[in-house]
A protein has these predicted regions:
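Non-globular, low-confidence helical/coil segments that flank catalytic cores
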Residues: 1-209
Length: 209
């Protein structure tokens, strides 16, 4: 499984280098948390590579909210060109991954926030044995509140991938307290032009360590 493919400036280069270095020849599940260009930047290149030079992609999972960017159009063109199965994925769906349980907790139906892409990210809880991971895409306060209200303690996870690159609009106190992670991973540029991750969010996690 591959979740998101990075910024459009990189065009999937670093993701592909990593996959090739680890002898990955097939992606059974390609998950697009949401269709912002900093999350789908490598989708087209990765689809092209795996469908023409490797062993293909089993299926793509997408929340179904379009973006008006060239990056998004190139992604859809690659899906169509190579006839890859594309699922519009919503809360309650499951992804078959053998003995590992993958539950889709978002986006809900109907969508939140007038179809805002961040607030309707695909949110996955992945559980293998005693270890669990919560991947929250770019979920912000409203989607986090929905998740807390809907799932409560079911959100508890060993590892949290913090929402929206550690932005102040995500990782709200009620959400962090409910997930109660032992480890937090923040994906962000080293010197983000947006100031991600924010000191407030970093301190929030530090206070709970």
């Amino acid at each position: 499984m591959l979740v998101d493919t990075g910024h459009y400036n990189d065009d999937g280069e670093y993701v592909l280098q990593y996959l090739q270095a680890h002898d990955i020849t097939r992606i059974d599940h390609l998950v697009t948390s949401h269709n912002d260009a900093d999350h789908i930047g490598g989708n087209a290149a990765i689809i092209e590579y795996f469908e023409t030079e490797a062993d293909g992609i089993g299926a793509i999972y997408d929340p179904g909210i379009a973006a008006s960017t060239q990056t998004y159009e190139e992604y859809l063109d690659a899906v169509e060109t190579h006839d890859v199965t594309l699922y519009e994925t919503r809360e309650g769906d499951t992804i078959d991954f053998g003995t590992t349980d993958i539950a889709v907790l978002g986006p809900p139906d109907p969508y939140l926030e007038n179809r805002a892409r961040n607030e309707n990210s695909i949110v996955l809880k992945i559980t293998h044995g005693e270890t669990s991971f919560l991947l929250s895409g770019d979920a912000e306060d409203d989607q986090e509140a929905y998740l807390v209200d809907t799932y409560g303690t079911q959100l508890e996870s060993t590892v949290l991938k913090a929402g929206h690159h550690g932005s102040s609009s995500s990782s709200s106190e009620p959400f962090v307290d409910t997930v109660a992670p032992q480890t937090v991973v923040i994906s962000s540029a080293y010197d983000s032009q947006y100031g991600h991750p924010t000191e407030t969010v970093l301190q929030r996690f530090a206070d709970r360590s």
